[in-house]
Curated annotation (Swiss-Prot):
This is Exodeoxyribonuclease 7 small subunit. GO terms for molecular function: exodeoxyribonuclease VII activity. Its EC number is 3.1.11.6. Its main location: cytoplasm. Pfam families: Exonuc_VII_S. It is found in: Cytoplasm. It comes from the Bacteria. Belongs to the XseB family. It is an enzyme of class 3 (hydrolase). HAMAP family: Exonuc_7_S (MF_00337). Keywords: Cytoplasm, Exonuclease, Hydrolase, Nuclease. InterPro entries: Exonuc_VII_S (IPR003761), Exonuc_VII_ssu_sf (IPR037004). Heterooligomer composed of large and small subunits. It comes from Haemophilus influenzae (strain 86-028NP).
Length: 84
């Protein structure tokens, strides 16, 4: 049942795999060794998911900084369709 996390997989795939592992563990019907393998896999997936979230936060901060540094232009009402 244990899968190796692919470092290139997206956040949603990582989260889905982690949720699946949590469900298996919560059921309580796995043998001890398999439960330990699933738990270990879950820890790896949680770390990978955390890395993905941190990368996304960094990208957002960079984009916000670029936006804050951009000069503001005066609003012109006729820039939108329907406004004349």
């Amino acid at each position: 049942m244990a899968r190796k996390p692919a470092s290139s997989q997206d956040f949603e795939t990582t989260l889905a795999q982690l949720e699946n592992i949590v469900t298996h563990l919560e059921n309580g019907d796995l043998p001890l060794e398999e439960a330990l393998k699933e738990f270990e896999q879950g820890v790896q997936l949680a770390k990978l998911g955390q890395e993905r979230l941190q990368q996304a936060e960094q990208r957002i901060q960079i984009l916000l900084q670029k936006t804050e540094d951009a000069p503001l232009n005066d609003y012109k009402g006729n820039d939108y369709e329907g406004n004349a």
